[in-house]
């Protein structure tokens, strides 16, 4: 019987099949490229270069033949189009960069290539990672594989849809205010945002530099741990990368998977784990279907030996205004370089240099990006800096301190990723504030720089996936992944696929 990726449920199985020569990297790449072509209506990919992909796959096969294969050699991966890639376009979902090709690879892309992974293409995303639905892309919206009339989440919606639909076994994403966790939840996959600084930002087109963080998106916690092993580590080219002296040491993120906690048993592997439930995450605004799925997941954790503890994160509501001051302020600075001279689209007709700047930016940026640039410029302007930006930074510190008080009472925090399941395409586009409010449960984690992840935990309205959010303390990714893996060993939500749920 010929090999089919449909029979594979994890990256480890895929790696084992490659190692056993049940399939070659080239055969695997061809299978996924065919799937991408067949599912073009999802609009998950912006750029596919089959010849380049197959050349990488053949190189992986040659590496294996020489006995030089790493654990992930030959395994395909899709990259969010916010990472620059030599030889591929890197658009950030924007007309401004529609034809941009980078002369170098982002560190994340470089490290995945060093691990032998094969790039399938560049995935669609909200323009410059600004959005929660993947409707802000210059290249059109991405459709959710579970219901193509709904959004996949954003801004890493193309990556989430690609993994959920089986167009790629794994993908890279970025998370500034929830852009790995929320689309993972909406699309029924697993994704983790590491501690800020764990993964290099070098070559990642910046949105908000103090918040942006790259991470893996796949089907399971084990997959994410394997990917994080390849992805994470100190990078001297990124000034925000955590140095070894600061705690950014290389580690094996798979080391705790399947291991009971100290003093626990195999039947109750999480005995002694204290799960903090922020009361602010279970109040008004949380839909009943999402709460039901999350509560059922928490009950499963109790069966695994964990205890539930109520904690408080009193400034949760303030995370929205704080984020939407700080992130646009940083975006207005970062995006100033896209002026038609240094980078990006240049208007065809203009009177003088100033007119060229204005027309190039007006034509090159979409509505949401323009909105955030204007907000950011305003809050940084003379007379408003202290009232808005400085005040937001002070509250950001309070939010981080609130998490530390909560972690004094628990080991991991859990709750919903989003207040609802994925909404219909176009449902919120006319009301940006409603779109922003959908990020209520993910923003504070990003503001604090903490690691957080989403794991599938059930289904809600219209059979749409629901994600459980797990939040850890700084550098606690291995424990988060262990905790998520234990849940996935006891349940099968992460094995469900669109059309087969």
Curated annotation (Swiss-Prot):
GO terms for molecular function: ATP binding; glutaminyl-tRNA synthase (glutamine-hydrolyzing) activity. The keyword Endoplasmic reticulum does not apply. Its EC number is 6.3.5.7. GO terms for cellular component: glutamyl-tRNA(Gln) amidotransferase complex. Pfam families: Amidase. It comes from the Bacteria. InterPro entries: Amidase (IPR000120), Amidase_CS (IPR020556), Amidase_dom (IPR023631), AS_sf (IPR036928), GatA (IPR004412), LisH (IPR006594). It catalyses: L-glutamyl-tRNA(Gln) + L-glutamine + ATP + H2O = L-glutaminyl-tRNA(Gln) + L-glutamate + ADP + phosphate + H(+). The active site is at 80 (charge relay system), 155 (charge relay system), 179 (acyl-ester intermediate). The keyword Transcription does not apply. Keywords: ATP-binding, Ligase, Nucleotide-binding, Protein biosynthesis. GO terms for biological process: translation. Belongs to the amidase family. GatA subfamily. NCBIfam families: gatA. Heterotrimer of A, B and C subunits. Allows the formation of correctly charged Gln-tRNA(Gln) through the transamidation of misacylated Glu-tRNA(Gln) in organisms which lack glutaminyl-tRNA synthetase. The reaction takes place in the presence of glutamine and ATP through an activated gamma-phospho-Glu-tRNA(Gln). This is Glutamyl-tRNA(Gln) amidotransferase subunit A. The gene is gatA.
């Amino acid at each position: 019987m010929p090999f089919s990726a449909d029979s594979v449920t994890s990256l480890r199985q895929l790696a084992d099949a490659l190692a056993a020569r049940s399939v070659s990297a080239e055969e695997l790449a061809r299978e996924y490229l065919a799937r991408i072509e067949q599912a073009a209506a999802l609009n998950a990919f912006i750029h596919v270069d089959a010849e380049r992909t197959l050349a990488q796959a053949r190189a992986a096969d040659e590496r294996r033949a020489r006995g030089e294969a790493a654990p992930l050699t030959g395994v395909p991966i899709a990259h969010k189009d916010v990472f620059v890639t030599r030889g591929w376009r890197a658009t950030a979902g924007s007309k401004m960069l529609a034809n941009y090709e980078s002369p170098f690879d982002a560190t994340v892309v470089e490290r995945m290539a060093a691990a032998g992974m094969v790039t399938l293409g560049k995935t669609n995303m909200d323009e410059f990672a600004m959005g929660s639905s993947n409707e802000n892309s210059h290249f059109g919206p991405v459709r959710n594989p579970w219901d193509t009339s709904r959004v996949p989440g954003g801004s890493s919606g193309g990556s989430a849809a690609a993994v959920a639909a089986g167009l790629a076994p794994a993908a890279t994403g970025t998370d500034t205010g929830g852009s790995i966790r929320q689309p993972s939840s909406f699309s029924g996959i697993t994704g983790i945002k590491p501690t800020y600084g764990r993964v290099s930002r070098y070559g990642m087109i910046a949105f908000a530099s103090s918040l942006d963080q790259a991470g893996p998106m796949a089907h399971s916690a084990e997959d994410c741990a394997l990917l994080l092993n390849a992805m994470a580590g100190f990078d001297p080219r990124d000034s925000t990368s955590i140095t070894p002296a600061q705690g950014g040491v290389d580690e094996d993120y798979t080391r705790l998977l399947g291991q009971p906690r100290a003093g626990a048993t195999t039947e109750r592997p999480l005995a002694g784990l204290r799960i903090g439930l922020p009361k602010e995450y279970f109040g008004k605004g949380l839909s009943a279907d999402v709460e039901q799925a999350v509560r059922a997941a928490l009950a499963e954790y109790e069966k695994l030996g964990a205890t539930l503890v109520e904690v408080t994160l009193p400034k949760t509501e303030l995370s929205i205004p704080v984020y939407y001051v700080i992130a646009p302020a940083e975006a207005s600075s970062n995006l100033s370089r896209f002026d038609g001279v240094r980078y990006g689209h240049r208007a065809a007709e203009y009177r003088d240099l100033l007119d060229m700047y204005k027309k190039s930016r007006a034509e090159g940026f979409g509505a949401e990006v323009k909105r955030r640039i204007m907000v950011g410029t305003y809050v940084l302007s003379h007379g408003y800096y202290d009232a808005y930006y400085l005040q937001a930074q002070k509250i950001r510190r309070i939010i981080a301190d609130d998490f530390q008080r909560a972690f004094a009472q628990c080991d991991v925090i859990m709750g919903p990723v989003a207040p609802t399941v994925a909404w219909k395409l176009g449902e919120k586009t006319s009301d940006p504030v409603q779109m922003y409010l959908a990020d209520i449960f993910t923003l504070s984690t990003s503001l604090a720089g903490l690691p957080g992840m989403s794991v599938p935990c059930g289904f809600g309205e219209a059979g749409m996936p629901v994600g459980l959010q797990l939040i850890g303390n700084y550098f606690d990714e291995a424990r988060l992944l262990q905790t998520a893996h234990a849940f996935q060993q006891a349940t099968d939500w992460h094995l469900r696929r669109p059309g087969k749920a």
